[in-house]
Amino acid sequence: MTADNSEQIAQWNGALGERWAAMQREIDRIVVPFGDAALRAAAPQPGERVIDVGCGCGDTSIELARSVGETGAVLGVDVSQPMLEVARARAVSTNRANLSFENVDASEAALPTETDLVFSRFGVMFFSQPFDAFRHLRKSLRKDGRCVFVCWRAPRDNPWATVSLSAARAAMGVTAGPSDPYAPGPFAFADDERVHAILSDAGFDAIRMQRVDVPLSLGTTARSAAQFALQVGPVSRFARESGFEHLPTILDAVERAFAPLAEAEGQVRLNGSTWIVSATNPG
């Protein structure tokens, strides 16, 4: 583990990782459409060897293992031990002998070589040194091997994240200050030109980026959507940093922001906007 990545790794092995592990089913339900779009772009084939970067609770790793079949192999890697415990249990329950997991930092760990596909669903935006990380990942690929991942586009295109955060800040009388758009986090890969530069610098070619938007169902009521938002996403961090005593105020503010956006039956759906990125290792 590098010193630069230590903060991220500590978070994903603490309360954050435990919370995501506990909410695995709900989180997977919401992001599955994006993962499916990335899987279609990756087109894993029987017999292929795949590395799933930032595999989390193993949802995409299991799908990849199904696609490559008994003659293929999938390695899911993640820094979060709590989430990997869920992933391993799910792999056992699905009887996937071609699937394994390792608790390592993909940006620097020794990874299998001659891999056919490096894949990730929302797992590559947290690298502290993304240029170095993708140089390292390319070394694991065979000649003409593929790298395919999905990442969030800009916050302005993702109201699922910004509506709740804006409401929380207003409730606390906080004005958003300047921030580093490239800092490790959900939106670090929003800038398509920077993503292209990272991959090009790492030695990839045939770089393609496709926009994929999907309405995200955050909850069946404004209240349940607000409760979910305070567990996952940018507003959850803001709420924690504001202090436990302010959680009721923030929850009520987010609920009020979601209420006029609810559909007739109460469902709260807000747009999620992503890049599906693919590239090839020329050798």
Predicted regions and their residues:
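Conserved catalytic/acceptor-binding region of the Class I
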Residues: 131, 139-142, 146-220
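Conserved Class I S-adenosyl-L-methionine
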Residues: 3-11, 19, 23-24, 28-31, ...
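Conserved hydrophobic residues forming the short capping helix/wall of the S-adenosyl-L-methionine
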Residues: 68, 91, 168, 199, ...
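A short acidic, Gly/Pro-enriched loop at the edge of an enzyme's catalytic core
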Residues: 107-118
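A short SAM/SAH-binding and catalytic strip from SAM-dependent methyltransferases
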Residues: 116-131, 153
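Conserved class I S-adenosyl-L-methionine
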Residues: 1-48, 59-63, 83-86, 105
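A generic alpha-to-beta junction signature in SAM-dependent methyltransferases
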Residues: 42-44, 68, 141
